[in-house]
From Swiss-Prot:
Name the record gives this protein: Elongation factor 4
CDD domains: EF4_II, EF4_III, LepA, lepA_C
Gene name, Swiss-Prot/TrEMBL: lepA
Organism (species): Synechococcus sp. (strain JA-3-3Ab)
HAMAP family in UniProt: GUFP (MF_03138), LepA (MF_00071)
Location of the protein in the cell: Cell inner membrane
Keywords per UniProt: Cell inner membrane, Cell membrane, GTP-binding, Hydrolase, Membrane, Nucleotide-binding, Protein biosynthesis
Length: 603
């Protein structure tokens, strides 16, 4: 079926906020075109990671090729490139959109436009895609398609005269959607004669065939056995297998401009086949790569340590395997006196961090200790040089630096207007600066704030959801760095600094954070044979302290009557012993203590 002319190929993706029915719609399209038989059909067919099904989110990109006979009697090939809808995976979305000519904008008829939808629509508009609005879930009792159409026109500025009303669950509107894709999405440019340029929009590691690269052929043609070159890394390989996804892989002899398929070429690591990179032929190279390739930059860092130090090698292997599939994951070895050997890992955002952590625990049976997430600070030293600090324990002392700058994000929240007050208050407590506020149709509002990323990564999202009873949605983008009065807060247990508990906080908040941290640790660290002081300090100045009293045996149990000096002697002896113990004893800090610090509300 590879002999379809370029004019009858349509490449499209589906843009939607989480839970607006994107995966279900994809399932219906696969069914309606007969790509998947009823026997193979299962809900959310393209979400093939166990974790994706469970959380109901799409993490990794999937692609599927469908054959469709349109009403004009012609056979078309429709390539659906599924996109993740979550804020952390924006780069994945952007490069999958770059592989398309059109997009279905799916909006829930009862919920309306959400913040994440907006962010992805702007990405689609940047890539000049034809956008087809689809109002989904019209079968719900609370559906208000007219209101939602008005909202899309008002908020995004799209013409919705051709919007399609649908219900993916009930199968309503599916034929109209397929026709709209054929009629309204432009075909790819016919550049089969040009030198090969293929855009990598995803890759995953197969233990038998090496890395399988998902590509959209932009120009030229590629055949099995061709020698190819990756333009960003300069590496060369020979193609062992070419194919298309229906959504199960099916080998073909060649792929030409406009088509979407996969390439296997015995590639050892996803590192070598970076997403967004351009593939070209060795003997006929393209003059320049496709635009838009960016190195994925980690924004949130944390330490991962095996709770049992014997598992260090397994953790390393597991991270390397995940890295094969996840180019945005970054890690380097780290040693912590409190936690032993582990890794410092960088992630795109909080959800990405949780997903990686859960996959490590689930798929590789590891038991992990995770330190508090931190962001990357820019520190200007006395000599004028700037360093990037992703770990609070590496922050230079105050006398060696002139300023600390923290990353600032622009947060856009869409919410019902009755919650505006409480959300504005939340943003103020998180050191936010108010930027903009717009009233939308039907009592909804958008709020725009600039907030320090450090405040967003802890528990901002949870608090936002609880303050708005789950009705708010948010999206954030980096806007740059800004200097502020930041200090490093150290936690000392029994006089020793526990580096994994150090955090960088704003000076105004240091006292409150320190006080609540030591109070929390006091509850969680078990009592020892000697008393254990827990202190929060900025530099050498202690700002909060709690003491865990010692466990004591009743040494007076065997003295019935007798002289008080006898009792005193025994008590003194016990006290001496405790003192000696304290000098040499070490304090066990349980994992719960680290996790509690992580979850601590910055009230």
């Amino acid at each position: 079926m590879t002999d379809v002319p370029v004019s009858r190929i349509r490449n499209f993706s589906i843009i939607a906020h989480i839970d607006h029915g994107k995966s279900t719609l994809a399932d219906r399209l696969l069914e309606a075109t007969g790509t998947v038989s009823a026997r193979e059909m299962k809900p959310q067919l393209l979400d093939n990671m166990e974790l994706e099904r469970e959380r109901g989110i799409t993490i990794k990109l999937q692609a599927a090729r469908m054959n469709y006979r349109a009403q004009d009697g012609q056979d078309y090939v429709l390539n659906l490139i599924d996109t993740p809808g979550h804020v952390d995976f924006t780069y994945e979305v952007s490069r999958s959109l770059a592989a398309c000519e059109g997009a279905l904008l799916v909006v829930d008829a009862s919920q309306g436009v959400e913040a994440q939808t907006l962010a992805n629509v702007y990405l689609a508009l940047e890539n000049n895609l034809e956008i087809i609005p689809v109002i989904n879930k019209i079968d719900l009792p609370g559906a208000e398609p007219e209101r939602v159409i008005a909202e899309i026109e008002q908020v995004i500025g799209l013409d919705c005269s051709g919007a399609i009303l649908a219900s993916a669950k009930m199968g309503i509107g599916i034929p109209e959607i397929l026709e709209a894709i054929v009629q309204r999405v432009p075909p790819p440019r016919d550049t089969v004669a040009d030198p090969l340029r293929a855009l990598i929009f995803d890759s995953y590691y197969d233990s038998y065939r090496g890395v399988i690269v998902y590509v959209r052929i932009m120009d030229g043609e590629v055949k099995t056995g061709d020698k190819i070159c990756f333009m960003a890394s300069g590496r060369e390989y020979e193609i062992t297998e070419l194919g298309v996804m229906r959504p199960h892989q099916e080998s073909v002899a060649s792929l030409h401009a406009g088509e979407v398929g996969y390439i296997a070429a015995a590639i050892k690591s996803v590192e070598h086949a970076r997403v967004g990179d351009t593939i070209t032929l060795v003997h006929r190279k393209a003059s320049e790569p496709l635009p838009g390739y960016k190195e994925a930059k980690p924004m949130v860092f944390c330490g991962l340590f095996p709770s049992n130090s014997d598992q260090y090698a397994e953790l390393k292997e597991a991270l390397e395997k995940l890295k094969l599939n996840d180019a945005a994951l970054y890690f380097e070895p780290e040693v912590s006196p409190a936690m032993g050997f582990g890794f410092r890992c960088g992630f795109l955002g909080l959800l990405h961090m949780e997903v990686v952590q859960e996959r490590l625990e689930r798929e590789y049976n590891l038991d992990l200790v995770i330190t508090a997430p931190t962001v990357v600070y820019q520190v200007t030293l006395n000599d004028g040089s700037v360093i990037r600090v992703d770990n609070p324990s590496k922050l230079p002392p105050p006398n060696e630096r002139t300023s600390i700058e923290e990353p600032i994000v622009r947060v856009e929240v869409i919410l019902p207007e009755e919650f505006v007050g409480t959300v504005m208050e939340l943003c103020e407590t998180k050191r936010g600066t108010f930027k903009d506020m717009k009233y939308l149709a039907q009592g909804r509002t958008t709020l725009v704030y600039e907030l320090p990323l450090a405040e967003v990564v802890t528990d901002f999202f949870d608090q936002l959801k609880s303050r708005t009873r789950g009705y708010a949605s948010m999206d954030y983008q980096m806007v740059g760095y800004r200097a502020d009065d930041l200090v490093r807060l150290d936690i000392l247990i029994n006089g020793d600094v526990v580096d994994s508990l150090s955090t960088i906080v704003h000076r105004d908040k240091a006292f409150y954070v320190g006080r609540s941290l030591v109070a929390k640790l006091r509850e969680l660290i078990p009592r020892h044979q000697f008393e254990v002081p827990i202190q929060a300090a900025i530099g050498s100045r202690v700002i909060a302290r709690e003491t865990i009293p010692a466990l004591r045996k009743n040494v007076l149990a065997k003295c019935y009557g007798g002289d008080v000096t006898r009792k005193r002697k025994l008590l003194e002896k016990q006290k001496e012993g405790k003192k000696r113990m304290k000098a040499v004893g070490t304090v066990e800090v349980p994992q719960e203590a680290f996790m509690a610090v992580l979850k601590l509300q910055n009230d």
